[in-house]
Amino acid sequence: MNRISLINKEHLISIINFLNDNSDEFNYFKNIGWNIKNIESQFSKDNNYSLGYFEDKNLVGVLIGDTIKNGKEYDLELHILFVSKDERRKKIATKLLNYIETNNLNFSKIFIEVAEDNVGAINFYQKNNFVFSNFRHNYYRYNDKNIHAKCFIKNINNE
């Protein structure tokens, strides 16, 4: 049975095992600063908002972010959206994003920063109605070169 649920520091061992099992594919995130220590730190934050996608009891996808207070509402800054290689092309990442829209009425926007050379991710977010907002110049550094970030926003509540 497939399900989406909130994940927190109580799930940390499962999350770390999931990322280690997918270490080749997760290297991209490691290269831009998301190592296991950063993941552990993220799950200790009060404003952590993270979801897991489970097939049976196996974690196969994660959405990791921060809630940001915006007046009476909250925005979500999305840090990581990752699905195991064997489970890709099954719309799991889209289901995780849709969960936010259908189950969290307090979020007004979702923000994401994507390395400009990550064309697959850029296409994915645009397909899911994220709109380009601005560049962050030289935001990432990996493979001895600076990479700009493209920032995207998705409005959820258009009231």
Describe each model-derived feature in a short phrase.
Residues 2-4:
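Extreme N-terminal starter segment of soluble prokaryotic enzymes
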Residues 6-12, 16-88, 97-99, 103, ...:
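Acetyl-CoA-dependent GNAT
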Residues 70, 136-138:
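Short, Lys/Arg-rich nucleic-acid/phosphate-binding segment
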Residues 84-98, 115-123, 127-128:
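Conserved glycine-rich acetyl-CoA-binding loop
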Residues 103-114:
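Conserved GNAT acetyl-CoA-binding A-motif
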Residues 115-119, 138-159:
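C-terminal "cap" of GNAT-fold acetyltransferases
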Residues 126-136:
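Conserved acetyl-CoA-binding loop of GNAT-fold acetyltransferases
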